[in-house]
Amino acid sequence: MNSKADVIAVSTGRAAYPQDKSRWFAAVKRKRLRLVFAFYSPDGNEIAMPIASMSAYLKRDFPWVDVILEAVLILRDADKYSPENYAKTIQELDADIIAFSIMSPHWYPMEPYFEQIKKLMPNLPVVIGGYQSMLSQQQTIENPNVDFICVGDGEYAIGNIVQHLKGLKPGPVDGMWEKLVDGEVYETEPHQIGDLAALPFPDYDVFAKADGFDDVNSSIFGPKGVLVLPVMTGRGCPYRCTYCCNTPLLETWKTKKTFLRKYDPEDMVDELIRLRDLYNVGYFEFWDELFLSNLKFVRAFFEIYKQKIHLPFSINSRVEVMNEKFCQTAAEAGCHTIWFGIESGDEEFRAKMLGRKMTNQQVLDAAANCKQAGINRLTFNIVGTPLETAENMRQTLRLNQEIAPEHFFFFPYIPLRGTPLYNIAKKEGLLLENKKELHYLSAANDRHFTLNMKECPQLLTAVEYDEICRQMLAFQEANNRLSYTDGVAPEVEPARVEDKSFSLVDADNSSASNSGQDRPIESAIAIVHKQEKSLFAGVRNLFRS
């Protein structure tokens, strides 16, 4: 294993690696290895930060690897990016390996792509990374068209696999699981890279087209007419929201402290200056899971950014830390928009079911502090969560109407494997087991809203869900006015996010795991069971304001 990479859990009883059963060791004979990175883009975004980081690492430490990007950009051309035609494109690239970075909701629509690739190129190893392989290891490796999965941080792991394919590094591919010729799976431990300074900054050239970035869609919410470049100042989030994939990852990390990793502020600003000047960047979007995970870093960063960068930017934040001083400091540094999650307008439901313990007054105060500082507000809200009632949804709408953020955004709940809320949904029999093709954000475009779980008429009927979502959509179209020009009123135009189709199915009938994170939620449900004969009627009462 790379000495710079720690492991999440050290195995003491791992069997010796049966190298004679590896189909891929020393399989690449030519001098230069051709590696294709891929990701699924159903929303139009064409930047993937994990790929940018792995590409930079490969280009620095393995110059004999040709790094190629061929993303699945289905919004650009559905026919060109169909599974059959995409596989033909990969065949034309003459690749030695293809590595997909996949989010969990995109797993099912991507499976036909793996199948078509293996039909055309049975000797091309397929590697899966991203949250899908980190959270759903067994489901991912069991796909007959998958050869390796990356189960942790991917930079050193991708370096290990290219050496494996060239026969330069005997032994297993540390940081990955490998499917052997006899069908057995050889497992290694996930990598956690604690020292980000040991890695190069992400490589954006991998996303450029023939005309540079003129035709690269790098942002969904950012301004048009300038290059909006997504950047990250670190990795990790200290919070344990029950619906978020970060929570099970945090639970497996060695310590909470090492899970939160930041670049040095001076180094980060120097990199932003380089990017600004190299690509003529007009706006930075900070894609950190939580920009404020280290307040000491934030204070230092804002001061240096203000002095050296002089570009507007947006960040993700939490209402608990958005006091007057913070918002004013952020505004002085150039912060244009703060994205923050409200998720639900019902305080009790939000705390007990979603793990978000802020009060509505904190939400209102944070929004007011932003407005006073001249910062735009973009709110995230989830609808259709397990055991949510119609009244819960109405409270979400009312709270946002009271705030009147510059951009109101709502989306259907997505059950993510391994998360506490997924486990509760599964335990209560709410997961859809047969229907794979669902919509994520495209519902707003289609004017048709359907639950991503089974209907609970005692709590929220399908008709009520559609009706309230339509009310939210009407508010969104009347309210949203996010502007990127100074002193110029924005053109009024209905907010529209391109299709984000995704698939959701739970083929695993095994019982949900009961992690420690489930206990607060299960306690709430247990109370309901005691108080009411009907779970759903009880939850209606428990979370009703």
Say what each PLM segment does.
Residues 197, 204-380, 398:
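Radical SAM [4Fe-4S] cluster-binding motif and immediate context
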Residues 77, 290, 318, 345-355, ...:
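Conserved strand-turn element in the central/C-terminal portion of the radical SAM core barrel
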Residues 57-61, 65-193, 412-418:
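Glycine-rich beta-alpha loop elements in corrinoid/cobalamin-binding modules
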Residues 36-41, 70, 101, 129, ...:
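Short hydrophobic segments within beta-strands
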Residues 41-49, 102-107:
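A short, glycine/small-residue-rich beta-strand->loop->alpha-helix junction that serves as a flexible
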Residues 2-45, 177-181, 185, 192, ...:
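C-terminal accessory regions of radical SAM enzymes
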Residues 139-142, 326, 387-401:
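Catalytic cores of alpha/beta
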Residues 34, 96-97, 283:
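Structural motif
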